[in-house]
Amino acid sequence: VTIAESHLMDLDALVKSRFIEMFGDPVEENRWARITLASLCTKLGSGATPRGGKAAYKTSGIPLIRSMNVHNGYFESKDLAYIDEIQAKKLDNVTLHKGDVLLNITGASVARSCLLPDYLAGGRVNQHVSIVRCDPNRMLPRVLNSIFTSDSYQRFLLEHSRMAGATREAITKDDLETMTVPLPPLSLQYKFAAFVAQVDKSRFVAQQQIEKLQMLYDSLAQEYFGD
């Protein structure tokens, strides 16, 4: 398992270094014009927890994404919550679309960001997760997510979350709207996206290896140490 997990970490590092090579540091870089997220995005906003909290969640239905699901560069589907149609109706303004970038905006996991998996389009987010929906004719979601998860932008987001003497980390909607990101040429963005798509194929294989080895370990452990 360790070798496969190490391979996954290497792939993440490869994508990060390729990003810096192509676009530079997203906080310091001045080759490209900078644009506010308010200008770039067609949607910036978080949702709410249904009345009744955890007890109100269902065993199936419409997915409700929480901060525990959002990790840097990947989505964790374990412990995914579900709500019913009536609860979802109240959160229609945060209906997820294919290509949305997710960003944790409060708590210990603040600043974590990933792309929404396509199969969760139509779901909702709670108050700890913001939808960041960029105009794909100006910036590809994959590029925006790579900006958010770069080391320097992570530091920038974390610093922002601790400003104004807040008792807990938080990035407000006003903060988000005024944040700027570099806007490289779309042709260069497509080249980067093609590179990441190739890396993702290797990532998928490595992930499958980890899961197979875990299943093998679990079955052996059950056989030798079980009842």
PLM region descriptions:
Residues 71-82, 101-104, 108-126, 142-146, ...:
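Short, ligand-facing micro-motifs at secondary-structure edges
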Residues 122-130, 139-142, 162-190:
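A short glycine-rich beta-alpha junction/loop motif
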Residues 2-48, 178, 182-191, 197-227:
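Non-catalytic DNA-recognition/assembly elements of restriction-modification systems
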Residues 30-73, 87-91:
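Low-complexity, Lys/Gly-biased intrinsically disordered segments
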Residues 119, 134-137:
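Short loop segments at secondary-structure junctions
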